[in-house]
């Protein structure tokens, strides 16, 4: 089952305006994350950075009770490193890394078919933060409790880096 991924009309320029399809085909409403810090990360199962799933899961397990959420978005945009179906992806993530953080349906994060959420994340005219581009799998967008982008983290930076952990725990 395929759900249309959409954005609600909103003047708040935040990720809270988005509803997307999760990896099981259910609606995931970002407005339910108001008051939580969020890491949005594009993922791939056949990438040299796939090992980051382990650190993402550890980070999620450690901080999920501290108003922190990780949202994974599988993408096949970089050297076709996420070729599988949603079913293949979640099976891989659960069996190999014990992933329990929310995973969304596979999307496009660059180019003319870029998903509306990633249009928001990468365009200053929409996010009021800065223009950016997704450079590779496992790029991280750190979103504050108001749904605004605060930091964009390189794909090569480990999810459990001091920079990210400090951001999560700041203000706790």
Feature locations, PLM:
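Structural microenvironment flanking redox-active thiols in thiol-disulfide oxidoreductases
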Residues: 49-115
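Proline/glycine-enriched tight loop/beta-turn segments at coil->beta junctions
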Residues: 33-38
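N-terminal "domain-start" segment that seeds a small globular fold
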Residues: 7-31, 51, 116
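Thiol-/selenol-based redox modules, centered on thioredoxin-like
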Residues: 116-119, 123-172
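Hydrophobic h-region of N-terminal signal peptides that target proteins for export
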Residues: 1-7
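Amphipathic alpha-helical repeat scaffolds
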Residues: 22, 42-46
């Amino acid at each position: 089952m395929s759900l249309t991924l959409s954005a609600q009309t909103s003047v708040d320029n935040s990720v809270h305006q988005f509803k997307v399809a999760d990896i099981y085909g259910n609606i995931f409403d970002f407005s339910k994350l108001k008051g939580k810090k969020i890491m949005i990360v594009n993922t791939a199962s056949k990438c040299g950075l796939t090992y980051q799933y382990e650190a993402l899961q550890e980070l999620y397990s450690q901080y999920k009770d501290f108003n922190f959420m990780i949202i994974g978005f599988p993408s096949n945009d970089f050297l076709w490193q996420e070729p599988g179906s949603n079913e293949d992806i979640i099976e891989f993530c659960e069996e190999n890394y014990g992933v329990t953080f929310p995973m969304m349906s596979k999307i496009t994060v660059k180019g003319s078919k870029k998903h509306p959420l990633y249009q928001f994340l990468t365009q200053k005219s929409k996010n009021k933060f800065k223009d950016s581009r997704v450079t590779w799998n496992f790029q991280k967008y750190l979103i504050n409790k108001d749904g605004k982008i605060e930091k964009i983290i390189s794909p090569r930076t480990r999810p459990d880096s001091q920079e990210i952990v400090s951001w999560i725990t700041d203000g706790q």
